[in-house]
A protein has these predicted regions:
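Short, hydrophobic-biased segments on the C-terminal half of alpha helices
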Residues: 60, 78-79
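Charged, amphipathic alpha-helical coiled-coil/dimerization segments
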Residues: 79-137
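N-terminal leader segment of winged-helix/HTH proteins
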Residues: 1-36, 136
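C-terminal regulatory/oligomerization modules of transcriptional regulators
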Residues: 1-9, 132-152
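N-terminal positioning helix adjacent to the helix-turn-helix/winged-helix DNA-binding module
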Residues: 10, 14, 42-43, 106
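N-terminal helix-turn-helix DNA-binding core of bacterial DNA-binding proteins
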Residues: 27-73
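DNA-binding alpha-helical recognition surfaces that contact promoter or target DNA
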Residues: 48, 76, 140
Length: 152
């Protein structure tokens, strides 16, 4: 990047739309989850990663790497999930202070119920408004904005 990099009008417009649409989509999903009496979307992200990890679970630092949470946020969220019986913390045998986080049966059921609402929201808010080709193009373009880029 150059010292005096100034965004083009097109870059500013794209950025503004990306930020606004992202916020609107997340708010719509959050509203749908709340109407369904379900936990916030952030819970789904953690439960999903833990379910994908299987019985071995994940260490907190691995969850931070796989999600968008800062360390202090993930600690509070994990405490809440544990208090609600959705995850369990297990000691790491070769690390006296370390813990592995594993999803419980209740956590799997909560994730399943959340996905019913979340998946429907994705289908309506994104899949129902764009063609398959448009979705593929959007996925490709957004992948290029990632760091590092996702090229699939």
């Amino acid at each position: 990047m150059t010292e005096k990099a100034t965004p083009s009008p097109e870059a500013i417009k794209a950025w503004a739309r990306l930020m606004r649409v992202s916020r609107q989509l997340v708010e719509s999903v959050e509203d749908a989850l709340k109407e369904g009496g379900l936990p916030p979307l952030a819970w789904y992200d953690v439960l999903h990663e833990l379910a994908e990890a299987g019985e071995g679970g994940l260490r907190p630092f691995q969850l931070i790497e796989r999600t968008l949470f800062a360390q202090y946020n993930i600690s509070r969220l994990l405490a809440r999930l544990e208090a609600d019986g959705l995850v369990e913390k297990l000691p790491v045998t070769d690390d006296g202070r370390g813990q592995t986080i594993r999803i419980t049966a209740k956590g799997r059921e909560t994730r399943r119920r959340m996905w019913t609402v979340y998946g429907r929201s994705i289908a309506e808010l994104v899949g129902g408004k764009l063609s398959a080709d448009e979705l593929k193009m959007m996925s490709t373009l957004l992948g290029r904005l990632r760091d590092p880029p996702v090229l699939d």
